């Protein structure tokens, strides 16, 4: 039908963004200015607002946006922040809003891979092994303090994240869709921890750093919590709505100039001198991998989607650059001695690379 593929109930434009697509009960259309007039299912943005309202009881609206970006781009999030900043609240609220299954894994030094993925149990009665699935079989996983468990446990989780399947007793099981892992690290306590190797950290689409709330925000948090006057999360959407929205996100338009901008930013982390950033040459021990370009492009499309736009703009790239790149750039001892971290390196690159 005139080059428009059908994805279930979603009609998606291949080229030209002025096509009206029906999605279940709602419509997604892009007007001549390229704005998304209604987003996928109109309930989707309602779901997003609902999550934001509940999470805002602890002022975590920006974290919710990042979770939704990862969810729409089929990625995972690494969170760094001290305890008590409503990380669990944000992801459990998101799961409730999408009527999805949520599990929390508390990582400890004595945890075993079988505790996460599941194991075989022998039944003497029927003299057979049966499979007992682990808590990894859920849509949303909170891996709390991932750096507290030994490497073999971390790699079991990271393999599941990458392959989206696990093997128990030689049998493979596909994980639920959607599948989002939010892993947390406490930046303060480093004693008795097992730091994630660079190759493992690279598998997280975003690394988000959460800071303390501002004075006014904390006053509202305190009042709301004491008065117990916070909104409850209701199931507004279903997991299948996420999968539908993902199909639409893929169709968000990204101009070649934006693609080039993303490539230039990532290449500047590898070859800073080619972009006139000679001072960074001795500050970077290794630059971002091709995963950075792929993830930055995917995240920008999802960001445009939640901002109700049918196309990506340079501001989207700049807004997400730190989250996508901060854990993919290695800094040298020289940089550490001068108190220069990856944040400053990314800011220097953004200030230098030409904006399309």
Language-model-derived ranges and their functions:
Residues 272-356:
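C-terminal engagement/docking regions of AAA+ P-loop ATPases
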Residues 123-126, 149, 161-254, 301-303:
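Canonical AAA+ ATPase core
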Residues 2-66, 233-239:
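Acidic beta-strand-loop-alpha-helix segment within the catalytic core
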Residues 71-108:
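Walker A/P-loop
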Residues 35-66, 251-260, 269-273, 281-298, ...:
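An extended, acidic
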Residues 82, 116, 184:
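P-loop (Walker A) phosphate-binding loop of NTP-binding proteins
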């Amino acid at each position: 039908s005139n080059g428009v593929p059908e994805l279930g109930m979603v009609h998606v434009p291949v080229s030209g963004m002025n096509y009206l697509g029906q999605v279940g009960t709602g419509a997604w259309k892009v007007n001549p200015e390229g704005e998304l007039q209604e987003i996928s299912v109109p309930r989707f943005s309602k779901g997003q607002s609902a999550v934001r309202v509940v999470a805002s009881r602890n002022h975590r609206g920006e974290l919710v946006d990042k979770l939704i970006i990862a969810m729409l781009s089929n990625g995972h999030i690494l969170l760094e922040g001290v305890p008590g900043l409503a990380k669990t609240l944000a992801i459990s609220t998101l799961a409730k809003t999408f009527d999805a299954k949520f599990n929390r894994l508390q990582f400890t030094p004595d945890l075993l891979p079988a505790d996460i993925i599941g194991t075989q149990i022998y039944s003497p009665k029927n003299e057979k092994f049966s499979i007992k699935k682990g808590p990894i079989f859920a849509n949303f996983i909170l891996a709390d303090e991932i750096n507290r468990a030994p490497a073999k446990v971390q790699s079991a989780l990271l393999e599941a994240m990458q392959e989206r399947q696990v093997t128990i007793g030689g049998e493979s099981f596909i994980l639920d869709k959607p599948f989002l892992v939010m892993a947390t690290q406490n930046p303060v306590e480093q004693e008795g921890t097992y730091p994630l190797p660079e190759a493992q950290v690279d598998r997280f689409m975003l690394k988000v750093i959460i800071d303390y709330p501002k004075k006014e925000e904390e006053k509202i948090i305190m009042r709301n919590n004491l008065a117990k006057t916070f909104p409850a999360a209701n199931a507004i959407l279903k997991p299948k709505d996420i999968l539908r929205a993902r199909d639409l996100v893929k169709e968000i338009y990204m101009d070649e100039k934006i693609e080039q901008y993303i490539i230039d930013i990532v290449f500047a982390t590898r070859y800073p001198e080619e972009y006139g950033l000679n001072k960074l040459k001795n500050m970077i021990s290794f630059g971002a991998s091709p995963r950075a370009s792929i993830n930055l492009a995917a995240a920008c499309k999802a960001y445009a989607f939640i901002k109700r736009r049918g196309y990506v703009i340079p501001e989207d790239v700049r807004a997400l650059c730190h989250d996508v790149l901060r854990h993919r750039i290695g800094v040298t001892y020289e940089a550490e001695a001068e108190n220069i971290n990856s944040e400053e390196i990314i800011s220097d690159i953004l200030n230098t690379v030409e904006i399309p």
